[in-house]
């Protein structure tokens, strides 16, 4: 479910033209006393996210626990309806080369990105087989110190003033019945 949402959102992010390298869902890892964001590379290992000096990149990560609650179903009293809330964070690093005014570039860019990814959720609803799917921005930061302290710990973070750093918080809310979750229990597994 979440991978389909991230793929859909990344297509919309790519269309903005701001970001060269749009990564999928990352995790904050702790290794040897250091905390940093990393992407799973499908070889049973995580690769640290390295900011591209020449371009720009973004990645998504869950910013908290997913909550699921049962809700009253106003359209069908006998079917169970669920409300799933996924807190997401979009973190990015974008070159300012085309900015006319670097003082307002970061805020304008965040507002543009929010406008692009939070519109037309009908496609997302259809992909998820959900009754309703909404992505709502809950806030953003363009303060590189705050972003660095949220994403890294015990790592010397070297700021690049040629780039804008941003972090946007979202809540993904999905209203669905059990069809939205089908397929997750069908994955092969072994007990042993």
PLM segments and residue spans:
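Small/polar-rich, solvent-exposed N-terminal microdomains that initiate assembly or binding
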Residues: 1-76, 131
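Short, charged interaction patches at domain edges and termini
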Residues: 1-18, 79-83, 128-192
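Short N-terminal helix-initiation segments at or just after the protein's N-terminus
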Residues: 18-38, 107-115, 167-178
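A broad, low-specificity signal marking well-ordered, structured residues that form hydrophobic/aromatic
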Residues: 57-59, 88, 166-168
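Surface-exposed beta-strand edges and their flanking turn/coil or helix-capping segments
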Residues: 74, 103-105, 181-185
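Extracellular/virion structural assembly segments
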Residues: 77-125
């Amino acid at each position: 479910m979440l991978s389909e949402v991230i793929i859909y959102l990344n297509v919309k992010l790519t269309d903005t033209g701001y970001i060269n390298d749009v990564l999928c869902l990352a995790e904050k890892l702790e290794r040897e006393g250091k905390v940093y964001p990393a992407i799973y590379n499908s070889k049973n290992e995580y690769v640290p996210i390295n900011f591209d000096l020449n371009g720009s990149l973004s990645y998504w990560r869950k910013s908290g626990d997913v909550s699921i609650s049962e809700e009253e179903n106003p359209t069908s009293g006998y079917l169970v309806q669920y409300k799933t809330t996924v807190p997401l964070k979009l973190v990015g690093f974008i070159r300012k080369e085309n900015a006319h005014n670097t003082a307002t570039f970061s805020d304008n860019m965040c507002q543009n990105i929010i406008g692009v990814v939070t519109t037309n959720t009908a496609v997302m609803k259809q992909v998820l087989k959900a009754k309703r799917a909404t992505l709502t921005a809950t806030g953003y930061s363009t303060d590189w110190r705050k972003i660095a302290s949220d994403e890294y710990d015990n790592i010397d973070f070297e700021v690049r003033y040629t780039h804008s750093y941003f972090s946007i918080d979202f809540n993904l809310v999905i209203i669905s019945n059990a069809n939205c979750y089908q397929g997750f229990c069908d994955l092969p597994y072994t007990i042993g």
